[in-house]
Amino acid sequence: YGLNIDFNYVTSFCDGNITFSINQLFFYTYLDNPLLLQSTTDGLYRLNNITGHTDSKGGETNVKIGYKDFHLYLGYTFTDTGTKENGIRQENILTPKHRLNSILMYEVEDKWKIGLEAYYFSPQKLGDGLKGKQYVVCGFMIEKIWEMFSLYANFENFTDRRQTRFDTIYTGSISNPIFRDIYAPLDGFVMNA
């Protein structure tokens, strides 16, 4: 079962030149006897229904501020998720507790769209019991629109943040690696148009 509730507030200032809206969401989800991937003694993995439960709870705040052709979107998400079995609760892996996002858009209708974005991910628990490192990913996009066609360019992760630059993706030797969880981008900077 689950429950979510959200609240919205919208207003404007300076004779309507500045718009402001905020959305606040709260959520809770509970799964009894969930299906989880578990390692076996022979080094393989198996999907098993556990006898406990998993739950997630948290909140998300989204703010939008507009001024003429500019729009700023700010967001924060808090997620607390864990699995409880035999009276012991453990934090779920690969789920950052804190996530921030920000997007600044400039848009002239039917002419231009330009956007700059940044996303922050807090440290998260990994399958080997260690914590991953925090990281930020940034992007930029631009689109010029004409009557019959448009040109578009997208620069993803232009700061070239890659897990291999700030953390390992395997331990042991290259001939006998033990692979770690992938929790951050591996591709680095990507451009498409």
Language-model regions: role of each:
Residues Y9, F13-L35, S39-L126:
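Gram-negative outer-membrane beta-barrel transporters
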Residues Y1-F7, I178-D181:
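Short intrinsically disordered, low-complexity coil segments enriched in acidic
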Residues T19-N23, L130, F155-E156, D167:
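Composition- and surface-driven signal marking solvent-exposed, interaction-prone regions
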Residues G127-K133:
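Solvent-exposed loop/turn segments connecting transmembrane beta-strands
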Residues G2-N4, T19-S21, K111, Y135-V137, ...:
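Active-site lining segments that contact anionic ligands and/or coordinate catalytic metals
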